[in-house]
Amino acid sequence: MQERHTEQDYRALLIADTPIIDVRAPIEFEQGAMPAAINLPLMNNDERAAVGTCYKQQGSDAALALGHKLVAGEIRQQRMDAWRAACLQNPQGILCCARGGQRSHIVQSWLHAAGIDYPLVEGGYKALRQTTIQATIELAQKPIVLIGGCTGCGKTLLVQQQPNGVDLEGLARHRGSAFGRTLQPQLSQASFENLLAAEMLKTDARQNLRLWVLEDESRMIGSNHLPECLRERMTQAAIAVVEDPFEIRLERLNEEYFLRMHHDFTHAYGDEQGWQEYCEYLHHGLSAIKRRLGLQRYNELAARLDAALTTQLATGSTDSHLAWLVPLLKEYYDPMYRYQLEKKAEKVVFRGEWAEVAEWVKAR
């Protein structure tokens, strides 16, 4: 059985989206995992904790014996069935534990005894994690062009359409604003960084990449923060600013935050609960900036939001949301972005409407 153990092997594994059967405990997996990994643990959290305590108190032999005792009989058979099914479903996959130690070797030997030869990651998750960290540091050294612009200018779509674009918000599962959350929960910080590194590796491998196209983001995207090496490079990058008409921006925001989010919530939860989740999502977003709006203005806009939701529920129309969205943009979001842009005005190298910026970026 050929094991993966070189830096290039690790990178090739990530670029190919090689399925990884991660046999670490769920708590370890939740703290950080590779993008193509599925968690089929050798031991659950309680079993792992018991074995760890035994190791500290009685040594490795006693801990190993306890592990075999805990994962035996029906429990072992159930886990074997899950591993066997995963191996058959992912014949090009690979096993992984924390450091390429006993857990992945034990699972590998059990599978071998059952007639399945399956490789493992030498060095385990730790080696893969070091690879993603190093890859991000290296790839972030390439030139970067940032796409800037006020809310609703279609920056994310423009980035998505570039062959050298990386959608940071999509990877973070958050659109970066008070209303930015999606129905997908955000990943742990380590998992987000691993996903970002894998995406950068794949994008770089597809072409002779000269520069990155990224959205002009702050350090935080929801609960995830950008790796410091990338964030530092972004502060030095050139910026192309999208300046679309206000009416076009309103159309985009209506589609993205009202029509699409309502559809997504009702699709996920059903009509009744989905509507409640959608209402809560909008109210939570507005409440998040209450202090900056001031209590009086917040209460006024919250009342307009309630009225707009009542109208939307009765008629299906989202037009009434303009009564609170327009002042929110003009009084809060637009002035805030323009203030931020003024502080880095020397970095702005191009301004234009969406199509003009797209053409400019394409020519780089």
UniProtKB/Swiss-Prot annotation:
GO terms for molecular function: transferase activity, transferring alkyl or aryl (other than methyl) groups; tRNA 2-selenouridine synthase activity. PANTHER family: TRNA 2-SELENOURIDINE SYNTHASE (PTHR30401:SF0). The gene is selU. It catalyses: 5-methylaminomethyl-2-thiouridine(34) in tRNA + selenophosphate + (2E)-geranyl diphosphate + H2O + H(+) = 5-methylaminomethyl-2-selenouridine(34) in tRNA + (2E)-thiogeraniol + phosphate + diphosphate; 5-methylaminomethyl-2-thiouridine(34) in tRNA + (2E)-geranyl diphosphate = 5-methylaminomethyl-S-(2E)-geranyl-thiouridine(34) in tRNA + diphosphate; 5-methylaminomethyl-S-(2E)-geranyl-thiouridine(34) in tRNA + selenophosphate + H(+) = 5-methylaminomethyl-2-(Se-phospho)selenouridine(34) in tRNA + (2E)-thiogeraniol; 5-methylaminomethyl-2-(Se-phospho)selenouridine(34) in tRNA + H2O = 5-methylaminomethyl-2-selenouridine(34) in tRNA + phosphate. Involved in the post-transcriptional modification of the uridine at the wobble position (U34) of tRNA(Lys), tRNA(Glu) and tRNA(Gln). Catalyzes the conversion of 2-thiouridine (S2U-RNA) to 2-selenouridine (Se2U-RNA). Acts in a two-step process involving geranylation of 2-thiouridine (S2U) to S-geranyl-2-thiouridine (geS2U) and subsequent selenation of the latter derivative to 2-selenouridine (Se2U) in the tRNA chain. Keywords: Selenium, Transferase. Pfam families: Rhodanese (PF00581). The active site is at C97. Belongs to the SelU family. This is tRNA 2-selenouridine synthase. One of its GO terms (biological process) is tRNA wobble uridine modification. It comes from Escherichia coli (strain 55989 / EAEC). Its EC number is 2.9.1.3. Coiled coil: none annotated. InterPro entries: Rhodanese-like_dom (IPR001763), Rhodanese-like_dom_sf (IPR036873), SelU (IPR017582). Monomer. It is an enzyme of class 2 (transferase). Residues 14-137 form the Rhodanese domain. SUPFAM superfamilies: Rhodanese/Cell cycle control phosphatase (SSF52821).
